[in-house]
Curated annotation (Swiss-Prot):
Pfam families from the UniProt entry: PseudoU_synth_1
Assembly, per entry: Homodimer.
Family annotation (PANTHER family): PSEUDOURIDYLATE SYNTHASE (PTHR11142), TRNA PSEUDOURIDINE SYNTHASE-LIKE 1 (PTHR11142:SF0)
Similarity comment: family membership: Belongs to the tRNA pseudouridine synthase TruA family.
Region (Interaction with tRNA): 168-172
E.C. number(s) listed in UniProt: 5.4.99.12
Classification via Gene3D superfamilies: Pseudouridine synthase I, catalytic domain, C-terminal subdomain, Pseudouridine synthase I, catalytic domain, N-terminal subdomain
Molecular function GO labels: RNA binding; tRNA pseudouridine(38-40) synthase activity
Keyword annotations of the record: Isomerase, tRNA processing
Species of origin: Escherichia fergusonii (strain ATCC 35469 / DSM 13698 / CCUG 18766 / IAM 14443 / JCM 21226 / LMG 7866 / NBRC 102419 / NCTC 12128 / CDC 0568-73)
Protein name as annotated: tRNA pseudouridine synthase A
UniProt-annotated site: Interaction with tRNA, residues: R58, R78, R110, R126, F139
Length: 270
């Protein structure tokens, strides 16, 4: 037995951006493409040892990320450029590292997070798009974004989101705290921006699906509040499609001092 000391272990956080349209979600699964699998493979090549990552939020199939955060541990000592440029050179073109930061032992990408923020982008036009067709959700009926915004404000604060929770959701509780929800129009694009401490499964897409019914004047503004109070998923609208959804930011305590690049996607301001 050697008395050599164990090499030091480094804990590293990364900001990750990805186009989820060609993946079966974030989480590694057997025999299907996942973002986690591609990232771990690229990191393992740079570290020259097996790497396992932990993420802030496991996005579903077809959902994108501009502000995903992960952490991993490694004995490999590398310069920041290796974890950014080097890893990116080993990643497919639809996944990229945006930043790197050494973090203390008590940091965890999921459990240290205090809030997550999503943006849902609707291309509101009579005709379907060709460019960015997998990065927006097409809705052909005219939408009243101001009406959608007003209807959504009842979701602020701590509420039971059973009516906007997927049937297969495994969370112990349907209660979540929504910090803001804003609906704005940018030309033909309608953007739903929502931030909460955490989300139940399909929560954003289920909220957006019902807000589109209000925006299209198929339901009154009061309908969202009625759905929230009913605590019945079967009364709400269908789940909005995955392709318009982006995880754009994750909040952490200031002491971790993580970078905060522009959220996007694309030209959308913070």
């Amino acid at each position: 037995m050697s008395d050599q000391q164990q090499p030091p272990v480094y804990k590293i956080a990364l900001g990750i951006e990805y186009d989820g349209s060609r993946y079966y979600g974030w989480q590694r699964q057997n025999e299907v493409r996942s973002v986690q699998e591609k990232l771990e493979k690229a990191l393992s090549q740079v570290a020259n040892e097996p790497i396992t990552v932990f993420c802030a939020g496991r996005t579903d199939a077809g959902v994108h990320g501009t502000g995903q955060v992960v952490h991993f541990e490694t004995t490999a000592q590398r310069k920041d450029a290796a974890w950014t440029l080097g890893v990116n050179a080993n990643l497919p073109g639809d996944i990229a590292v945006r930043w790197v930061k050494a973090v203390p032992d008590d940091f965890h990408a999921r459990f240290s997070a205090t809030a997550r923020r999503y943006r849902y982008i609707i291309y509101n036009h009579r005709l379907r798009p060709a460019v960015l067709s997998k990065g927006v959700t097409h809705f052909y009926e005219p939408l009243d974004a101001e009406r959608m915004h007003r209807a959504a404000q009842c979701l602020l604060g701590e509420n039971d989101f059973t009516s906007f929770r997927a049937v297969q959701c495994q969370s112990r509780t349907p209660w979540r705290n929504v910090m803001h929800i804003n609906v704005t129009r940018h030309g033909p694009y309608v953007v739903v921006d929502i931030k909460a401490n955490a989300f139940v499964h399909h929560m954003v897409r289920n909220i957006v699906g019902s807000l589109m019914e209000v925006g299209a004047n198929n339901q009154p503004e009061s309908w969202i509040a009625e759905l929230l109070a009913a605590k019945d998923r079967t009364l709400a609208a269908a789940t909005a499609k995955a392709e318009g959804l982006y995880l754009v930011a994750v909040d952490y305590p200031d002491r971790f001092d993580l970078p905060k690049p522009p959220m996007g996607p694309l030209f959308l301001a913070d």
